[in-house]
Structures are given as C-alpha cells and as structure tokens.
C-alpha cells in the first residue's frame, strides 16, 4: 500500500512514465481523464488503476533511475548509465567516506548515499546546494541527510 507524501510512478499503455507525490486531495490529470490520489493510496504496488475515462496505468514505486531522470534540477545531471560505472570505479561501498566537489542536482550524491557512503560535499552555488539537498530528502528521505554534509563554498 502507498501513503500520502510518497512518490509514485504510473506507466500508461504507451509506456509513458508519470512521477508525482501523493497528496490527500490530489488528482493526477491527463487527456485520458483523472485519477484521485486517494484511490492510489488504497492500492498495492503493481496494481492496474483506471482513470475516469478508463485509461489503465500500472502503479509502481519509482526507482532511483526514474527519479534522477525526472527530478527537478538546476544543473546538468549525470545520467544513470554513467552513475553506475562512476560508483564502481570509485569503489563506493557502505561506510565509504566521499568528498564530492560540485553537487549539481544531487544525482551522484543520491547514488552514493543509496550505496551507504558518507558524503562531504562542496557546492559554490547555494541554489544548486539547496536543490541537491531537497532532491536527496525527496527520494531517500530526511534520514539520508545525516550522511550528507553540504558546504556552500569554493572547494579551493
């Protein structure tokens, strides 16, 4: 079952992906009708839900890849096809202490945090630092911020 405040992913018959956060009075709208968030909350992951016009959607929890592709960003994002090799080549493991320079929108940070790294990051732009922290909190939860120390200043 899902809960309000949680992110969900709907996939339609044409494989289009819709990512949004469930809200108590929220509705998901498309040209194919709408779907009340309260209906989604009562369903299990993998269920097929129907809009008011009968359009079918598969209901899933978004993966990190889904979020990275669709997350709000200020800076250019590192895409999932590059995130995995970066983390492998950097040997990121649970408890690894990482120094990250230039946080951007937080895609690399989220990937390393998901693998259990502890990150100290520097970002010269406050808006990018804020966006990265918001994205981490939105997808990984507030508890992930305890492993993510962000400094708004030049790394030099």
Describe each PLM feature range.
Residues 1-61:
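N-terminal auxiliary segments of SAM/dcSAM-dependent transferases
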Residues 81-98, 109:
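Short internal alpha-helix immediately C-terminal to a glycine-rich phosphate-binding loop
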Residues 105-117:
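Conserved SAM-binding loop of SAM-dependent methyltransferases across substrates and taxa
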């Amino acid at each position: 079952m899902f809960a309000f405040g949680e992110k969900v992913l709907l996939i339609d018959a044409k494989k289009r992906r819709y990512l949004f956060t469930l809200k108590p009075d929220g509705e998901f709208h498309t040209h194919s009708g709408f779907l009340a968030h309260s209906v989604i909350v009562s369903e299990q992951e993998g269920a097929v839900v129907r809009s008011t016009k009968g359009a079918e959607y598969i209901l899933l929890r978004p993966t990190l890849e889904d979020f990275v592709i669709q997350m709000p960003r200020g800076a250019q994002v590192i895409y999932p096809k590059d995130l995995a090799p970066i983390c492998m080549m950097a040997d990121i493991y649970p408890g690894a202490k990482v120094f990250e320079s230039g946080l951007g929108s937080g895609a690399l940070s989220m990937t390393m945090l998901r693998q259990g790294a502890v990150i100290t990051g520097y970002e010269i732009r406050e808006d990018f630092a804020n966006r990265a922290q918001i994205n981490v909190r939105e997808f990984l939860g507030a508890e992930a911020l305890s492993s993510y120390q962000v400094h708004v200043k030049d790394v030099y």
